[in-house]
């Protein structure tokens, strides 16, 4: 089971627009389509790809990936289709933006009801403004994950994009787990 698989997007550059306000260096602002392109050379382009779901399934088969956790949102028709057409291969997760408050909690509930959400993901350094792992804006999300008995996958440590990392210090997890001992907290990229 792959716990972070993405179905290729038609416009990969647009996929990262949410964090562009955090970029300061010239390469990230002007040159890169992919925010961590400085680490990964020859990033594949998928703009002319036909059936994105079939392509993803073929790649999963090629690498013997039986199932994959994919991100779904209320506006992502491709991920929704993949989950509906291939429930035996794809499992739903959703990203969260704690700056949106209770709107995000309602979104988690709706996606859980509609797609049997298996996890929530968070990228604290990618939030605008950034939100530390132990910030109170995350608490309603942590509580909802406990209530739904699903894990939260949180990016911790140094982020790949050239943005500040203080909000993702692993030490911040300690306080979260003290307040939420039932929370299934998974460190991603840690």
Predicted segment positions?
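An N-terminally biased module of ancient metal coordination in phosphate/nucleic-acid-related enzymes
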Residues: 1-69
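Conserved, mostly hydrophobic/aromatic
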Residues: 4, 60, 111, 145, ...
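Active-site neighborhood of phospho(di)ester-bond hydrolases with catalytic His/Asp-centered motifs
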Residues: 1-3, 70-71, 93-94, 121, ...
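Histidine-centered active-site/metal-ligand motif
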Residues: 4-6, 86, 155, 189
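Structural recognition of alpha->loop->beta junctions
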Residues: 113-119, 170-185
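Histidine/acidic-residue-rich catalytic or RNA/ligand-binding cores of hydrolases
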Residues: 12-13, 164-172
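A structural motif corresponding to the C-terminal end of an alpha-helix
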Residues: 58-66, 86, 147-148, 179-185
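Active-site gating/metal-coordination segments in enzymes
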Residues: 66-67, 73-168
């Amino acid at each position: 089971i792959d716990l972070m698989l993405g179905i290729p997007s038609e416009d990969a550059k647009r996929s990262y627009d949410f964090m562009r306000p955090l970029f300061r260096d010239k390469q990230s602002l002007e040159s890169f389509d992919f925010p961590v392109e400085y680490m990964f050379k020859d990033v594949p382009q998928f703009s002319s790809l036909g059936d994105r779901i079939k392509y993803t399934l073929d790649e999963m088969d090629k690498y013997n990936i039986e199932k994959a956790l994919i991100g779904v949102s209320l506006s992502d028709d491709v991920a929704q289709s993949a989950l509906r057409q291939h429930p035996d291969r794809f499992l739903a997760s959703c990203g969260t933006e704690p700056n949106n408050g209770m709107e995000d909690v309602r979104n988690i509930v709706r996606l859980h009801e509609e797609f049997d959400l298996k996890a929530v993901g968070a990228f604290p350094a990618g939030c605008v403004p950034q939100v530390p792992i132990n910030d109170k804006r995350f608490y309603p999300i942590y509580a909802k994950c406990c209530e739904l008995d699903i894990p939260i996958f949180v990016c911790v440590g140094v982020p790949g994009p050239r943005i500040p990392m203080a909000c993702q210090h692993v030490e911040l997890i300690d306080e979260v787990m003290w307040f939420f001992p039932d929370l299934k907290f998974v460190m991603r990229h840690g």
